């Protein structure tokens, strides 16, 4: 059975109360709809049905054969059509079925920071776009797959988490989730103009075109991006793991899902064991709706699994009295917090993210090229019809459309350049014409770290980790970003068809000289936005490190994944990653979650 027909079958059998077997352990389990409130006591409560949460849920269900009660508390609801998602692309014809907004690779760039995606933006992280819904950010992002370098695992992760330990899990992910650089169902690369323009420049530097989804020894490599897709549709944790335990949006026996529900507080007993999770459940996706309070209780030997992501997992722990004693004033600035009841010096500490600088170019050279606006449904009608008919064409293509990874004075990749087939700002505006493309320079191994801090409403505050000028680490990041951006500007200058439209020397920054490295430094450190365009110190949503694996004291126990200071709280998401991943991290997050499922399930053996 092909994967697309298999997805349709899952939708059908889900409503018939059946399920396929994940590893043949879930066959013939009857299902029930998502629940309106928690009842009784649970063997496992998973806070967050995102990238890691859905993988761990599927693994634990397979291990238990449906004999354990597992509850997912998720702030959003259904996403992909294969798990009952009904939020449709705005261009889908009436009566069409089998395709949700999140299934279309090209659609993802029209969701964050737009009216279309506003209901899915988590309100507790107001400075950025964190998507809510089953599958989490893996349903909202570009699913660009890269591998954490083996050297990083061997040098910076605890014993037992080296490359030989993790390589089988990367292999397993790719078995469950196809990775390709031609996501269009017809196998034809889409929106190739930017790659056709810049890849010859990369070749001139001696950099190598190769499979950038796998570890590489070269100093510089480039490719069309390798992404998670199959038959022209988004692939990921939902398609690779979760749709088998939630077919058609009907959870199999043993799984319950509290949708539109936010965890407010973890209740601990006197021994540091989580006893319950107090939550607020809304009646729909709208986060402004009032909710009903409730509590989900654990069995005496139950397990609480934190899978809400690198920002929200530490947020809930901190609000629940778990954190670094003595730093309450830093974490709750301007407030009068009570001392943390459970000591763990690594909760909320060591936050990292990648950081971006953007430059937009115009092109008038010999390579055929036209910018592509995925939100122009009227202008793209023929492409939409092609996608509906064959799952091929531009809407089967994620952004970006070109990737370059470099080692600059480093034994691991520390700079990436990716290119999108469109300009900056409003389509048709001064920086987004028919011949524009945008290059993003990203630090893959930034040195700056920070704290998760909360405002008086309990929301996560903007972290000062994006090249802060007042720290040695920030200065080191500024130096690398300056040099990397300067070098790319000089390289792109070698193609006479490329000219800067937004960036130093353009109408947006006429007083800055792109050939002067100090002016480039001014550009990469100047405040955004300018002329309505955000271009410097950009967040990337690759957070982690906020409840990291350590050999102690504090942090998470590498052997059990239990958060030290607690008796039964496990962490399985990006929070436990001990150091920045010098790659797009979704593959690493998935590999960690797959292994976490094995570690946690072993307690039932």
Segments (PLM) and residue ranges:
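N-terminal export signals
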Residues: 2, 8-30
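Glycine-rich loop(s) and the adjacent beta-strand/alpha-helix scaffold that form part
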Residues: 55, 59-70, 76-88, 266, ...
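Redox-cofactor-proximal catalytic regions of oxidoreductases
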Residues: 85, 90-207, 368, 439-466, ...
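Conserved redox-cofactor binding core of oxidoreductases
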Residues: 139, 152-269, 274, 508-509, ...
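FAD cofactor-binding and catalytic pocket of flavoenzymes
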Residues: 159, 358-484, 536-545, 571-574, ...
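A glycine-rich dinucleotide-binding beta-alpha-beta segment and adjacent secondary-structure elements
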Residues: 264-265, 498-580
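A conserved FAD-binding loop/helix module that cradles the flavin
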Residues: 581-595
């Amino acid at each position: 059975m092909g994967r697309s027909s298999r997805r349709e079958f899952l939708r059908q059998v889900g409503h018939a109360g059946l399920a396929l077997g994940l590893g043949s352990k879930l066959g013939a389990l009857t299902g029930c709809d998502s629940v309106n409130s928690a009842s009784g006591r649970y063997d496992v409560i998973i806070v967050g049905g995102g990238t890691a949460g859905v993988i761990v849920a599927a693994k634990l269900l397979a291990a238990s054969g449906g004999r354990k009660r597992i509850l997912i508390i998720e702030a959003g609801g259904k996403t992909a059509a294969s798990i009952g998602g009904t939020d449709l692309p705005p261009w889908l014809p009436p009566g069409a079925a089998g395709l949700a907004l999140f299934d279309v690779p090209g659609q993802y760039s029209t969701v964050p920071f737009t009216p279309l995606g506003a209901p899915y933006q988590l309100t507790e992280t107001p400075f950025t776009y964190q998507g809510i819904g089953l599958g989490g950010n893996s349903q909202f992002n570009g699913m660009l797959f890269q591998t954490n370098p083996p050297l990083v695992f061997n040098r910076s992760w605890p014993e037992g988490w080296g490359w030989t330990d993790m390589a089988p899990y990367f292999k397993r992910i790719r078995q469950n989730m196809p990775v390709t650089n031609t996501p269009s169902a017809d196998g034809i690369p889409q929106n190739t103009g930017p790659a056709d323009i810049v890849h010859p420049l990369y070749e001139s530097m001696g950099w190598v075109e190769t499979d950038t989804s796998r570890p590489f020894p070269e100093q510089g490599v480039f490719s069309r991006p390798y992404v998670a897709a199959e038959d022209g549709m988004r692939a990921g944790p939902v398609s690779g793991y979760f749709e088998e335990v939630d077919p058609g949006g009907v959870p199999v026996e043993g799984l319950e899902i509290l949708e539109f529900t936010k965890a407010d507080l973890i209740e601990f007993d006197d021994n540091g064991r989580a006893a319950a999770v107090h939550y607020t459940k809304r009646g729909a996706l709208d986060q402004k709706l009032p909710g009903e309070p409730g509590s989900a209780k654990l069995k005496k030997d139950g397990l609480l699994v934190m899978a809400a992501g690198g920002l929200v997992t530490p947020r809930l722990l901190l609000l629940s009295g778990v954190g670094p004693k003595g730093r309450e004033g830093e974490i709750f600035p301007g407030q009068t917090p009570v001392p943390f009841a459970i000591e763990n010096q690594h909760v909320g500490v060591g936050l990292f993210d990648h950081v971006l600088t953007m430059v937009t170019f115009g092109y008038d050279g010999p390579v055929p090229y036209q910018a592509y606006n995925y939100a122009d449904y009227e202008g793209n009608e023929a492409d939409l019809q092609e996608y509906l008919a064959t799952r091929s064409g531009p809407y089967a293509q994620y952004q970006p459309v070109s990737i370059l990874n470099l080692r600059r004075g480093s034994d691991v990749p520390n700079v990436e350049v990716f290119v999108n087939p469109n300009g900056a700002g409003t389509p048709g505006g001064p920086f987004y014409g028919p011949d524009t493309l945008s290059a993003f320079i990203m630090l893959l191994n930034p040195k700056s770290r920070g704290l998760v801090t909360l405002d008086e409403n309990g929301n996560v505050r903007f972290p000062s980790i994006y090249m802060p000028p007042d720290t040695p680490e920030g200065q080191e990041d500024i130096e690398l970003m300056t040099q990397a951006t300067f070098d790319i500007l000089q390289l792109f200058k070698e193609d006479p068809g490329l000219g800067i439209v937004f960036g130093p020397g353009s109408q947006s920054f006429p007083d800055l000289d792109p050939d002067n490295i100090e002016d480039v430094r001014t550009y990469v450190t100047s405040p955004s936005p300018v002329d309505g365009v955000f271009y410097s110190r950009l967040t990337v949503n690759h957070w982690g490190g906020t409840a990291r694996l350590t050999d102690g004291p504090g942090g998470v126990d590498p052997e059990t994944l239990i958060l030290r200071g607690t008796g039964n709280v496990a962490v399985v998401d990006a929070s436990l990653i001990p150091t920045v991943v010098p790659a797009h991290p979704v593959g690493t997050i998935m590999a960690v979650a797959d292994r976490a499922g094995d570690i946690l399930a072993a307690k039932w053996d």
